[in-house]
From Swiss-Prot:
It holds the Pfam family 7tm_1. Residues 39-46, 103-129, 189-211, 266-305 are cytoplasmic. This is Mas-related G-protein coupled receptor member A7. Orphan receptor. May be a receptor for RFamide-family neuropeptides such as NPFF and NPAF, which are analgesic in vivo. May regulate nociceptor function and/or development, including the sensation or modulation of pain. It is found in: Cell membrane. The lineage of its organism: Eukaryota, Metazoa, Chordata, Craniata, Vertebrata. One of its GO terms (molecular function) is G protein-coupled receptor activity.
Length: 305
């Protein structure tokens, strides 16, 4: 039974890795287009800065999984243990960064709806840029410290309690991001359906809600397994390993879904043959309610272009 288990696991790993390659190619292409348009073709506001950084995190996250699956399918030998630790740490950083960006986007949107006067008049101008820089730096630091104390040098230095403290801090931070994401999303939904003055739908609001929904369905399971791995040192059973592979495929789907969401929301009720990708993305991130007059005006502007 011990001789046949690794072979069966390899066969079971083949299909997920093929799916990661396929979804990875789609996601890399889509996120590269979003990065190009947001980086060089569109004027960036507060939300677009977060979405640009989210697309960058998704692109690099997909690239890591694509390389990992390609090495598995091509049977490329892993150089050494340090490479594994570094590669795993990079994926951790990118996952936490993506979750942090989503929480920041939802919180930013919540503030713009619940405190519109403060948001538009007193909010510091470069808050989004500063927050994105802080998120990247903080994600890198906590992941490097966790790997340093627990996996790479932990047994040599005997830092068991320091490792446990870093694990606790990592888990607490993940829980904090998840709670912030859920509370800000619930506040937006409550304001939309239960407020005295009901908030009107905008394409940006729909884009944010769909992005969060896809993350909760596809991105969260991998984070859940990862959270358990921090505290459970024993090996997975075959069933757990299958679920873990499924969670990896789902998180790849999550990272490649955002450009598809932008395309879907931006092209809804518009004629695709008269739209460029720039127009579609700009429409998906539009933060004004669409009245009939607005749609006529947009159609006139696009016709002139």
């Amino acid at each position: 039974m011990d001789e046949t288990s690794p072979r069966s696991i390899d066969i079971e790993s083949l299909i997920p890795n093929l799916m990661i390659i396929i979804f990875g190619l789609v996601g890399l292409t889509g996120n590269a287009i979003v990065l190009w348009l947001l980086g060089f073709c569109l004027h960036r506001n507060a939300f677009l800065v977060y979405i640009l950084n989210l697309a960058l995190a998704d692109f690099l996250f997909l690239l890591c999984h694509f390389i990992n699956s390609a090495m598995f399918l091509l049977k490329v030998p892993i150089p050494n243990g340090i490479f594994v630790y570094c590669f795993y740490t990079i994926k951790m950083v990118l996952y936490i960064t993506g979750l942090s960006m989503l929480s920041a986007i939802s919180t930013e949107r919540c503030l713009s709806v619940l405190c519109p006067i403060w948001y538009h008049c007193r909010r510091p101008e470069h808050t989004s840029t500063v927050m994105c820089a802080v998120i990247w730096i903080f994600s890198v630091l906590i992941c490097i410290l966790k790997e340093y104390f627990c996996d790479f040098f932990g047994t040599k230095l005997g830092n068991y309690y320091v490792c446990q403290a870093s694990n606790f801090f990592m888990g607490a931070y993940l829980m904090f991001l998840f709670v912030v994401l859920c509370l800000s999303t619930l506040a937006l939904l409550a304001r939309l359906f239960c407020g005295a003055e009901k908030m009107k739908f905008t394409r940006l609001f729909v884009t944010i809600m769909l992005t969060i929904l896809v993350f909760l369905l596809c991105g969260l399971p991998w984070g859940f397994f990862w959270f358990l791995l921090i505290w459970i040192k024993g090996g997975f059973s075959v069933l757990d390993y299958r679920l873990y592979l499924a969670s990896i495929v789902l998180t790849v789907v999550n990272s490649c879904a955002n450009p598809i969401i932008y395309f879907f929301v931006g092209s809804f009720r518009h004629r695709l043959k008269h739209q460029t990708l720039k127009m579609v993305l700009q429409s998906a991130l539009q933060d004004t309610p669409e009245t009939h007059e607005n749609m006529v005006e947009m159609s006139r502007i696009k016709a002139e272009q």
